[in-house]
Amino acid sequence: LFEENMLLFSQTVKDNERKEKLRRINKSPTNDKDLKKRFGYDLVYPSVYETVKDTANFIWIQKQVQKGHLNIIAYEISDNISDKNFNTKILNIRDSIGKLYIPGRLKGSYMITERAYQPYFYKVTLDGKKGYLTKGTWEVANDFMAGPFINYILWNSLTEKWMVVEGFTFAPSMNKRDYMFELNTIITTIKKVN
């Protein structure tokens, strides 16, 4: 009985914390509609996030924080991902996107998935769409940078493409729990629009 109540209490605290974070985000939401125009998805995030990179199939927004930054990237892919191969496919996709779009500080460096610590994989439903959630650690190939990431990949049956939205944090020697909570809260607001 105690354990059941602790789980219920813990979930209630998380739900209330998420509601409060959304309330604060909605005080000053962004007017940026690039994600909506490009991919047909709406994402609620604060106006303090600024676009870092915007290409034909990739959007990267960033918020500066003390000693680092919070990042959200979004892109679509046409790939054959199934329950049998999603954990390998997602990591390979992340690494190829990192090499293409997310450079490190040094020449020839770029973001990849850290393989030393096995990421966690989950099946999810978000905005009524089935998909996958991956939580793990990113690092920079050929440099010494790393941090946590959370990656959602959702199937859009209308376009027959996967929508990928990912949050990652770089804040050396800082507790990243609140940063990752903010990124996850923002990402879970994703909605398909016409």
Predicted feature locations:
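Surface-exposed amphipathic alpha-helical segments
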Residues: 2-22, 43, 49, 162-194
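Charge-rich, low-complexity N-terminal segments
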Residues: 14-20, 27, 64-67
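Long, compositionally biased interface segments
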Residues: 87-91, 95-112, 173-194
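Signature of long, low-cysteine stretches enriched in small and polar/charged residues
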Residues: 1, 99-159, 174
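Glycine-rich, often proline-containing surface loops adjacent to acidic residues and nearby aromatics
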Residues: 70, 131-134, 161-167
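A short, polar/proline- and glycine-enriched secondary-structure boundary/capping micro-motif
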Residues: 70-73, 144-145, 175-179
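N-terminal "mature-domain start" segment
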Residues: 25-53
